[in-house]
Amino acid sequence: MDLIGFGYAALVTIGSVLGYKRRGGVPSLIAGLSVGLLAGYGAYRVSNDRRDVKVSLFTAFFLATIMGVRFKRSKKVMPAGLVAGLSLMMILRLVLLLL
């Protein structure tokens, strides 16, 4: 079972709900829940086959790119820098699973 992947998905999902409660942005909530569900699906696939990282890798790369750009613009570590950093660590972990 890919506990790290499921934890990453849970953090993204919970973060989107907390961000919605704080700021009230419905598009951010929908995007965050969608990415969280996609990350959860990717973790499920990795749980069944450790080399099936395509969905998880795509999701982490997408989130790292989006949040990396937001971090570069805003210079705020929370939440953009934190999510970009976690996504980069997920990418590294997934690539290492392929080796």
From Swiss-Prot:
Location relative to the cell: Mitochondrion membrane; Endoplasmic reticulum membrane
Sorted UniProt keywords: Endoplasmic reticulum, Membrane, Mitochondrion, Transmembrane, Transmembrane helix
A Pfam family of this chain: Tmemb_14
Gene Ontology CC terms, in alphabetical order: endoplasmic reticulum membrane; mitochondrial membrane
Transmembrane portions of the chain: 1-21, 24-44, 79-99
Family (UniProt): Belongs to the TMEM14 family.
PANTHER family: TRANSMEMBRANE PROTEIN 14, 15, TRANSMEMBRANE PROTEIN 14A
Function as written in the Swiss-Prot or TrEMBL entry: Inhibits apoptosis via negative regulation of the mitochondrial outer membrane permeabilization involved in apoptotic signaling pathway.
Protein name: Transmembrane protein 14A
Species for this entry: Mus musculus
Lineage of origin: Eukaryota, Metazoa, Chordata, Craniata, Vertebrata
Gene name tied to this protein: Tmem14a
